[in-house]
Amino acid sequence: MARTHIPGFPRIGAQRELKFAQESFWRGESDEQYLLGVARELRARHWQLQQDAKLDFVTVGDFAYYDQMLNLSALLGALPQRFGFDAKTLSLARYYELARGNAAQPAMEMTKWFDTNYHYLVPELGPQTTFDGGVEWLFDEIDEALALNLPVKPVLIGPITYLWLSKSHVAGFDRLSLLPKLVIRYSRLLEKLKQRGIEWVQLDEPALCVDLPVEWLDAFSAAYDVLGTSGVKVLLATYFESAAEHAPRVAVLPVAGVHLDLVRAPQQLDAWRAALPKHAVLSAGVIDGRNIWRADLGEIFESLQALHAEFGERLWVSSSCSLLHVPVSLDAEQKLDADLKSWLAFATEKLGEVATLALALRDPAAAEATLAAADRALDARRHSSTVVNALVQKRVAAVSSAMADRQSPFAERNRLQREALGLPLLPTTTIGSFPQTPAIRQARAAYKRGELRALDYLQRMRAEIEIAVRKQEELGLDVLVHGEAERNDMVEYFGEQLWGYAFTENGWVQSYGSRCVKPPIIYGDVYRPEPMTVETTRYAQSLTQRLMKGMLTGPVTMLQWSFVRDDQPRSTTALQLALAIRDEVVDLEKAGIRIIQIDEPAFREGLPLRRGDWAAYLEWATRVFRISAAGVADQTQIHTHMCYSEFNDILPSIAAMDADVITIETSRSAMELLDGFGAFAYPNEIGPGVYDIHSPRVPDAQAMQRLLERACEVIPAERLWVNPDCGLKTRGWPETEAALTNMVRAAKALRAKLAAKQPDEVTA
């Protein structure tokens, strides 16, 4: 009989309870005990959902107070030495300082978890890293679950993935040299699990789905030769891509089973079936853990029948990956179109899908009604008139190659823009958003509840825009933004104004820490019925004589940060988005806006995990960006913004986007990203972020000037812009004004220094 489990479950809570408890703790409004209590309640609730779905295992260890990689660093005793914290006595307050920074130290670096929109904190390792052990929250959670008589399956990120995703803080240090010590620590952790009577442990190794060098693969084999004989059965979990080429290697290791992502990489199944020994468990990840569409249970059931006949009780049915990447439950969705809602499955519903498949394998008659209901929903979706728009189909068919090209090359555009815009050396600007104050959030909530008239809401937003404009003028910024007071989210705001999009009331997923996003759903062809930002941007420009920058979200990011329809290629949906954004760019230019930013923070996130698959993605991703941007005159300056990214391996494609200015996240990595831009001789203008907006720490003007001087060593000052790392939506006004004051001072001081050619430095 097939068994059931999931790799992980969302931790934030159906009503974002963890987020609100975290932020209350950070503000000093509640203590650690309150936060611990909320976390305990959430874990128990999520375990009970798995029990209620009749899963054979309850997953424990997927919870984190901020991030699972940070949790693992704390458990291993591998905290950044620069903080001086003792991992064994780590408090939640200090745990959060690692994630958010403090007065003495900036936060740990944060970057994307593989090709998802989740962010993890990058471990900082070096020769002095000992893995002596740390705070054992994991075992507290296991004990909680055991006390509830639950069938516990702990989950940990595996040692190879942990090292692969870490960074060395010592130049030239080979972090793989730490593996022997790390394996010893993992072995001790597994021994503690054995002492608690744990039968199975899930060790996540998604790094096996990227292009690992051979020395890392050999290290993987050596590690699991040890860990597989710990006395606890190891389920080696891979996800997000195929790991088929490693099947022969894994087959000779003493691991008791493997988990495969058969949604993203169904083609790998045959290799694993051929390689796995007769005793090994195959965990089939057949329910999509990264998208919200109801599964075709009938088709999946048919495919599982042959596997079940072959593997019997060694077949486990599961989701493709952790359900962290989808909302918790459809129960709270009262306003979704009924037909659309019937096409969806969130995390809780996916538990039911996993259980239904196992039931169908055991007793087809018992699952017949549920399978039939799924078939009816899928059939209704296939034939719905809301999915296809003839106008969009006609326009997509008419797209030409010329639509992706600006009128002139960058050098000519740059000359014309310098004449038209009249900006100083090292122009200062921000990335777009300003603090979303309680007053802004309350007004938006009241408007959405129908308690505030549209005209009153418009007046309040215009008042906030004027505040943002006046503050920027006082700060001395060169290029202003309207502050995005009216925008709840950089994707949702636009999606709400496009056909083919739908929105949930409570479809939150965790992006990082307490930051949650509510991705819209692209269910049909995308079309812009009317301008989206023109009136707001025109109003903001009317308040000032300075340049006002229009702010849009790019087609790739709209795609990546939405739940995307799965009935046509993603590239087709991206092209539809590009055409909608192109129309908005043209309308902004007609309204007198001479600088327009098309944000693409998720551009790199869309890269396939395997380098061999990159070229096809980069071709269509750069094309749709260019189509979105190329409808304007040469004198109109197009900016783009990217954050949390490593660009060096895709710089030709970044250059091919042909944005006049790119702003990037660099402050946490001490401008190291710029080295690649310099070596590549990136031709266009660039704004390296000079301070980290994710930390409440305000760097002084001297520190920012040093970063700018470092940037000038790589990029000519004539092509540099000065800006923060990212938008300022999540920050408060006092720290925002303090940081921007220092940023402007740093830019002015460096301008003067470059003009005078003397080494005077600003004072803090």
Swiss-Prot record:
Catalytic site positions: H694 (proton donor)
Binding site for L-homocysteine: I431, G432, S433, E484, D599
A Pfam family recorded for this sequence: Meth_synt_2
Binding-site residues for 5-methyltetrahydropteroyltri-L-glutamate, renumbered to this chain: R16, E17, L18, K19, K112, R515, C516, W561, E605
Catalytic activity: 5-methyltetrahydropteroyltri-L-glutamate + L-homocysteine = tetrahydropteroyltri-L-glutamate + L-methionine
CDD domains assigned to the protein according to its UniProt record, in alphabetical order: CIMS_C_terminal_like, CIMS_N_terminal_like
Binding-site residues for Zn(2+), renumbered to this chain: H641, C643, E665, C726
InterPro entries (UniProt xref): Cbl-indep_Met_Synth_N, Cobalamin-indep_Met_synthase, Met_Synth_C/arc, UROD/MetE-like_sf
Pathway assigned in UniProt: Amino-acid biosynthesis; L-methionine biosynthesis via de novo pathway; L-methionine from L-homocysteine (MetE route): step 1/1
Alphabetic keyword roster: Amino-acid biosynthesis, Metal-binding, Methionine biosynthesis, Methyltransferase, Repeat, Transferase, Zinc
Biological process annotations from GO: methionine biosynthetic process; methylation
Job of this protein: Catalyzes the transfer of a methyl group from 5-methyltetrahydrofolate to homocysteine resulting in methionine formation.
Family: Belongs to the vitamin-B12 independent methionine synthase family.
Stated name of the protein: 5-methyltetrahydropteroyltriglutamate--homocysteine methyltransferase
Species, as recorded: Paraburkholderia phytofirmans (strain DSM 17436 / LMG 22146 / PsJN)
Recorded name of the encoding gene: metE
